[in-house]
Amino acid sequence: MSGDSGSAGAGNGGPPDIDTSVAHVARVYNYWLGGTTNYPADRQAAQQAMAAYPDLALSARANRAFLARTVRWLAGQGIRQFLDIGTGIPVNNNTHEVAQAIAADSRVVYADHDPIVLAHARSLLTSSPEGATDYLDADLREPGKIITAAAPTLDLGRPVAIVLMAVLQFVMDEERPGDIVAELLDAVPSGSYLVVSHPASDIDAASMRELAKRLNRLMVQRVALRSRAEVTQFFDGLELADPGVVRIPEWRPDSPADRGIPSTMWGGVGRKR
């Protein structure tokens, strides 16, 4: 999310107009997921962060699995429209792939404000013939712009699932993330859903404080940790789906053993009444 293009990165082997000399969250996250769209500065930052919390890559992959589970569950609830904000660099099990595997007519809009994600957006636009996908170059901090730009693809008179997967941590408290979420929800009708995952301040707190300290030193983007109570506030006024806001491996796991997967992220799904 919210990447800023810097000087040309050609000297580091990166695409033009993308500065690969400084770690960027999308590429660092890609490294944790086992991807290849990352550069030496990203790998160094990722490894230093993992020194603070060695299970970080497992936690990142658990977040990706949480995305797939929530999208499958929402499709099972009849949701056919998804607005995925802060989508990051495409890997496997992208939102439209999961949704359209269940309902081919699903419509998905991705939004991110990151030149490296934009460079890879083609792989997010491979919709089934019955459905549709679109990609918006837009920042979460501009919810009105996102809603306006999504309207040609999504029918905002019908329920929409708003997906905020590991993105709200880049919105500082003074930027009023709760107001951003509320504005997005105000634009969609009853029966819509909100999906949130967020790194925790109150799971393995000492390790997470050190992790955030390192990431804030090494990356352009700043990271804010939040408690379970703070993450739950994003769902104010919504009906939380069982089991509520929990560690993401504990949200409707595919098998009981998955509950033990290391993760320091809270996650939940709420329905607009």
Where are these regions (language model features)?
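Rossmann-like AdoMet
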Residues: 1-138, 143-144, 148-156, 185, ...
